[in-house]
Amino acid sequence: MSVTIEDIIKDLELEVINKGKNVNEINVSDINRPGLQFSGFYNYYANERVQIVGKAEWSFLDAMQPDLRKKRLEKYFEFDNPGTIVTRGLIPHKEFLESAIKNKRWILRTNNISTRFINRLMNYLDVKLAPETRLHGVLMDVYGIGILITGESGIGKSETALELIKRGHRLVADDAVDVKQIDGVLNGTSPYITSGMIEVRGMGIIDISALYGLSSVLKTKNIGLVICLEQWKKDENYDRLGIDKEYMDILNVPVRKLKIPIRPGRNLAVIIEAAAANYRYSLVSDVTPVDVISERIQELRKEDGGDE
């Protein structure tokens, strides 16, 4: 993924003071404040980043003699960069504009103060530049846990999601889930076209927000647990104690995965609710039901006079 300065102008509503010749792709979410460059130091200059000129940099330039300021700015604008953004609505110096126009560099402006704008810009770039993929499944918010329900087509993922929605949980995406990895966290959302919709075989497409209210649909959710629905296999050795832990790799992030075999009479919605509650409990406690059972066995052995 990449972003251009024109994307930033549009999405962050920036004022264009001077239009540059090149529209360079931005591939990093970090920014640079060119105070050192204005002083003439160009070692380790990160000119591939968006440049931010705030009150400190502006005041530094303002304190210079015009001839020196012109010299320093001509040197600065000789280097190509995606664009320079002036914050606080500051008016660029005459030498600043002349050098930018001469070298055909992008100069933009925002009325935001530097700190707030930098946070906003870096968050924007983090999202835009994050690694992403599209997965087949249903993403639900169950008890505050983002659960990705996977399984082969026709196994009942959407029907299970519909039952969960009836029980008060929220839909994020059905059938196609767009996933981005931001700082090791997987964030899932729905493609725009299918947002708020569920496809149920035999009924067609259902508008969840229209039938169950806007609160039944969530725009985005971090993925904490993957539940894979599969047909019951007689010879499969399913985990009965919760000791064996399996993970699914999504964009190089391991996510806890549970296999739920489907069999007549099993209430999948209730099982998924229990899985979500159990996962949430595991985040705050290291004690598992197996630990509790082991302690009880030890207690019974002691009562019977055995300590082994």
UniProtKB/Swiss-Prot annotation:
The keyword Cytoplasm does not apply. It catalyses: [HPr protein]-L-serine + ATP = [HPr protein]-O-phospho-L-serine + ADP + H(+); [HPr protein]-O-phospho-L-serine + phosphate + H(+) = [HPr protein]-L-serine + diphosphate. Keywords: ATP-binding, Carbohydrate metabolism, Kinase, Magnesium, Metal-binding, Multifunctional enzyme, Nucleotide-binding, Serine/threonine-protein kinase, Transferase. Mg(2+) binds at residues 158, 199. Signal peptide: none annotated. InterPro entries: HPr(Ser)_kin/Pase, Hpr_kin/Pase_C, Hpr_kin/Pase_Hpr_N, P-loop_NTPase, Ser_kin/Pase_Hpr-like_N_sf. Transmembrane segments: none annotated. Residues 198-207 are annotated as: Important for the catalytic mechanism of both phosphorylation and dephosphorylation. Gene3D superfamilies: HprK N-terminal domain-like, P-loop containing nucleotide triphosphate hydrolases. One of its GO terms (biological process) is regulation of carbohydrate metabolic process. The keyword Iron-sulfur does not apply. ATP binds at residues 151-158. The active site is at 136, 157, 175 (proton acceptor), 240. Its cofactor is Mg(2+). CDD domains: HprK_C (cd01918). It holds the Pfam family Hpr_kinase_N. GO terms for molecular function: ATP binding; magnesium ion binding; phosphorelay sensor kinase activity; protein serine/threonine kinase activity; protein serine/threonine/tyrosine kinase activity. Residues 261-266 are annotated as: Important for the catalytic mechanism of dephosphorylation. Its EC number is 2.7.11.-, 2.7.4.-. The Walker A ATP-binding motif also binds Pi and PPi. Catalyzes the ATP- as well as the pyrophosphate-dependent phosphorylation of a specific serine residue in HPr, a phosphocarrier protein of the phosphoenolpyruvate-dependent sugar phosphotransferase system (PTS). HprK/P also catalyzes the pyrophosphate-producing, inorganic phosphate-dependent dephosphorylation (phosphorolysis) of seryl-phosphorylated HPr (P-Ser-HPr). Both phosphorylation and phosphorolysis are carried out by the same active site and suggest a common mechanism for both reactions. Homohexamer. Belongs to the HPrK/P family. This is HPr kinase/phosphorylase. It comes from Clostridium kluyveri (strain ATCC 8527 / DSM 555 / NBRC 12016 / NCIMB 10680 / K1).
